[in-house]
Amino acid sequence: MVPIGLDDDLARRRPPIVSAGHTLPSYSLESLTMIDHFALGWVTPILSFLLSCAGCAVGLTCTARARVSHGIASIGWLALGAVSIGGTGIWVMHFVAMLGFHIRGTETRFDVPLTIASGLLAIAVVGLGLFIIRTAGVGPFTLVAGGTVTGLGISAMHYLGMRALHVGVEVTYDIPTVFMSVLVGIVAATAGLWLSAKVHNFAAGVGATIIMGVAVSGMHYTGMAAMRAEVVTGTVIVPDGGVSVAALLGPLIIGVTISTILLLLVVGLAPSAAELEAQEKFKGWQGRQEEIQREAAEPRRRSQLL
């Protein structure tokens, strides 16, 4: 596989590049360490932000219904919220943003098992955070604890996803920037968990969605800013492992489309949070009326016995 995007005048008489048993020309160090996070222009950051907002919006709708549900129904809504926020709002946003990532002179390939594992991790940690808030309440301690656990998990998802990249060069990270990205992730997760427990109307939901989309995107690009690429021993091995972006794009589009349609169907067909709350109030009122009727009937029953 020949490196892409290099002009002939960049070639240098350096040690050869080896790929799948073939000897290829070598290139200058500068051409191989140029990282471009926006190789496709503003398409990927805007699209990834919109997808993040969409996932967070559906997720907030699910968590709102979890608040007014009980038992298995509440757990089910929390699970759907975790899939929406962790899957679409965070992981899909990360992957789509990575479509614009390119190191000049190399081809980006993905380790499929690690890529899938990063998505499952995102869903799991968001689900854990939502469960903590749902069961323990939105106190300062639980909010900080849930936000920290979820933020660390999201950061782990990001760097696991980066570990899944095969780029043919040595990748290192600027430690202070890594810590900054983790901090951003914790703040974003804490804000998201707080919003998941507090959003009650459409206007607040729109604002919360935008805040969460900005926070998730900010964490991703802060983490990407920590990345450094270096040539190993003066040569570059063109990556042969993993699969290409094009090979993953089709399954990703199909998977996201199907899951989004299913989520929207569930959310659309199920009662809204307001309707569920009204049902709970009606059940409470009905129970009180039955109790009043029983109390009113008790004197008559006693008189009949006498």
Locations of the language-model features?
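Peripheral, non-catalytic segments of secretory and membrane proteins
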Residues: 2-10, 18-306
